Amino acid sequence: MSFLQKIFGSSNQRALKKMQVHVDQINLLEAEYQSMDDAELFALRDKLAKNYADDLSNLIPHAFAATREASVRTTGLRHFDSQMLGGIALADGNIAEMKTGEGKTLVATLPAYLNAVQGNKVVLVTVNDYLAQRDAEWMRPVYEFLGLSVGVIHSNQNFEEKKHSYECDVIYATNGELGFDYLRDNMALRAEDKVQCSLDFAIVDEVDSILIDEARTPLIISGPTNESAEYYVQIKKIIPKLKQQLREGTEEEPLLEDEIGHYMIDEKNRSVELTDEGYIEVEKYLEDLGLLQSEDSLYSVSNIKIMRYVNATLKAAYLFKKNVHYLVRGQEVLLVDEHTGRTMSGRRMSEGIHQAIECKEDVPIQKESQTLASTTYQNFFRLFSQLSGMTGTADTEAAEFAEIYGLNVSIIPTNQPMARIDNEDLVFLTREAKFKALIAEIELLKEKEAPILVGTASVESSEVVSELLKKKNIAHQVLNAKQHEKEAEIIANAGRPGVVTIATNMAGRGTDIVLGGMKSDDALEWGERHQKVLDAGGLHILGTERHESRRIDNQLRGRSGRQGDPGYSKFFLSLEDDLLRLFITDSRRALFERIGMGDDHIEHKMLSRGIENAQKRIESRNFDIRKSLLEYDDVANDQRQAIYSLRSQLLEEDNISEAISDLISEEMHVISEDFVPLESVESQWRLAELDRHLTEHYLIEVNIQNQVNQDKKLTPELIADLISNTAASRYKEKYISIEQNIEQLEKQVMLQILDVHWKDHLAEMDHLRQSVGLRAYAQKNPKNEYKREAFEMFETMLNAINTEAIKILFRLEIASEEEIQELEQRSLEAQKNKEMRLQQAKPDLEVGNENAQNTSLEPITRDQPKLGRNDPCHCGSGKKFKQCHGNA
């Protein structure tokens, strides 16, 4: 602690001191609210809103005191002072770090009621449907006692149910469903088809999971493309014939003949690349398969597409492991979330990797897809007028919360002193020695009848531990992505005496492990179990490896020691664990190996520092990745907001005919200037071409050549006005018979064209994003280039929307109002019946929704001179092809 901190206290201590003033005021008001009858508390909302509309400082104590009293009367739970501190932190738009078991669900009722009094919609965000429904039902009596309505948003609701839920005062919802509803609303063809409420105030539960772990996760609504899956099937045949190369050759130490291979794996950066020999070998196999013509080159521009299939198949084969990165359930490949250990239904990897894994596992290959609408959690949650959050582990990410979201972290003291004992890590030379020591520890603790939670980082590790326990005849239960349906039951029993539970990181975010197990009807029996566990030292956490993030390790520890209960945690590590193997230097590894003795563990401060520094480096790298994603997505987000704002205006306006008239005038002036430039002379005018263009594209006959022949005083400006006026008259005449309903037609045309162009624009932005990094070779800043080109593309898209809309409106043949209604109905049905899958993707991921059909493949032929791997790249970067577009 610094000298100044000793005098003034830390920033967190100073913030808590200010909040304590409010807590004291709330406690003074407690007797006053205890004296109120139920009817008075029910009607209090309007009274508080009237008396303290512009006085938040005085509103907080009254709103919080009322909520505390309502909770006591309905649930029997009284908010502790520490929970009041958490509520004040949330009300101020901060993140409240509150340890496991401190009652975050109850805390959320305080700022929720406060904001409802202020007239704000309150959204409480959870990580899954179960928690949203559980928390809503648990807290519903409190809210309804205070006159508030409560809604729950989940994935299985129909339109009417969801619409009703969003109309409530307090809404519980998952982060994914909120994001998808936002995207769906901005694809609606009628204003009444929107469901989502205004985004006023959000309380994000497990905020670190949603805003940090999921920050790189784009929310994508997508539809299928026509890419063939047969390429994966054919290229899969090549992979077993390739040999791995274990090191790069150097001048000092060139590769021996038997060391030369076809591909190299970089585990640290999770990449796999073909070597020069590998490219030659793959070309030969592709020719044998008929996918590449003889004498053609895999490096030519026309063959970039097939390289994508090769790269995806290599990654699927060597970087993604079954039961670690994904599971196969039935006929489907399900990704496993590295942070929680849960399967991620509906999520698919992009760049063809998911299809390649499906091919590898011999399950039906689903089609790739095209993005129809997308956003990121980072940008979606920044749409809320005020954002706050709760978690047990936020302090290690405080800098990121502040920089990205403008959220400060308030560390709330526990209601009872922490009694958990956190032991030093035990580090072994080998995984075998580590697991041997782990099993011995479990046997020892089981004799004491202590409940044991063994935390693993993957399904594979959990199954290894399970097999070892079976050999020792130690009864246990397993909670991983394969058994996630039993999660509630397993967690409920995890605190019983002598129970051994093996769990991946999914172990109970949002669910407490109660010492002695869940309380039963037999209070005496539960009391005996509870005391037995207390005597054994509480819940014992045994970690089998360190996670990349210190925060995830802290979450595992946080399962124990709730509300002042005793607890114990210890990590068993080995130098063969991924974190230590990839991020501990060779020199340090050699030192630790000299220190270690057989199956004994290593204890050394240098090792502890090395592990922590490795975690910090990874956390810093991941932060940089998330920050970079945001910088790019901010560009897309500005465009997204502009398009969605335009869509909202189109939906909400009763009549857009005036805007259409302006567009017609603007479009006609642009066309006129293309053929009759301003400041030009008559000899430069292309009048015949102008007449032909107007007739062919807009069915407008102006006969401008005759007009000019008859009136020599016509200037380019007057010609443009003449064309504009003629077009306006023609448009009015065209729709005179359906004048009352013309706005319906105009809206439908504008919306559909806007959506089509926006979809294509998203694809172009994806392509730009993937290729813009190459600009660095030309000494240009990729981010600046991305911003510049994205802006130009956006302007081009807006102009194209206007042009196409006017063309269609002039060419569309509508004879009656019934035809307009039929057109609108067809559009709505197409929207409902469109085969789309919703996706919470991994970074830049896509999704398909149909099984790909086997099709015969034509060999890819080149239409450019053969390009060698060491030739200059076609993009003009000046780099060799293998270092540029040929880089796997």
Q: Can you say where each PLM-predicted feature lies in the sequence?
A:
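Conserved P-loop NTPase motor core
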Residues: M1-G596, S645, D662, E666
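Generic detector of short, well-ordered, non-transmembrane alpha-helical segments enriched
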Residues: F3, E397, G498-V499, Q639, ...
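Alpha-helix capping and helix-coil boundary motifs
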Residues: K50-L59, Q157-N158, Q293-S297, D521-E525, ...
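Generic detector of ordered secondary-structure context
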Residues: L59, S302, M349, T393, ...
